Design a protein with these regions (language model features):
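Core nucleotidyl-transferase/polymerase catalytic module
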Residues: 1-185
Length: 185
């Protein structure tokens, strides 16, 4: 990322981080997700969902559908639109950003939180718990399968080896729990 772009991207990232905090998503602390993973491993009521290559999968189109036009305009102004390949050719990007961009982490958190909240509202979940930290998503088990479908429809791939809906094991933000016991390697 060009240095000047990065400066503006970080500014957008900070604004997104503040907006997320107002919604109860604290990107400076992973312990909420870790605690919910613990509870999910004990009670079985919460699922932990992880995505493959999430940072490289947030498309321009999903952002256009979810974000206000002024936010989208600001992000498009400071994002890298092309990548130069080793052979010297350039390739147009259809994703909003990649890791290394100053707002990717905050934006992917917002997108996954919005989709998870929408699913919980759509199916009228009894347990409306939604916790998101990057691509580490926690929702009630009743919402998990529908959320996985919605994520797939939006172009995201679930990491099946790190997604736990059933059984006594849960993992989120680097912590692994089996029946309430920390089994983090």
């Amino acid at each position: 990322e060009p240095e000047l772009n990065m400066m503006f991207q970080r500014g957008i990232g900070k604004l997104l981080k503040r907006k997320l905090l107002r919604a109860g998503i604290d990107l400076s602390d992973q312990t909420r997700n870790q605690s919910l993973a613990f509870h999910g491993s004990v009670m079985g009521n919460l699922a932990t969902i992880d995505l493959e290559a999430a940072s490289d999968s947030v498309s321009l189109e999903i952002c256009r559908q979810l974000l206000p036009p002024d936010w989208m305009e600001a992000m498009e102004l400071v994002r890298c639109k092309y990548v130069e390949l080793p052979n010297g050719s350039s390739h147009k990007l259809h994703k909003i950003s990649s890791m290394g961009n100053g707002f990717t982490f905050e934006l992917e958190t917002l997108v996954f939180w919005a989709l998870a909240k929408a699913v919980c509202d759509e199916i009228d979940c009894v347990d409306k718990t939604v916790a998101v930290y990057g691509d580490d998503i926690i929702v009630s088990t009743e919402a998990a399968h529908r959320l996985i479908e919605v994520l797939r429809a939006c172009g995201f791939r679930t990491n099946h080896e790190k997604t736990f809906v059933d059984g006594p094991f849960r993992e989120s933000c680097g912590k692994h729990f089996f029946r309430g016991r920390d089994v983090t390697p």
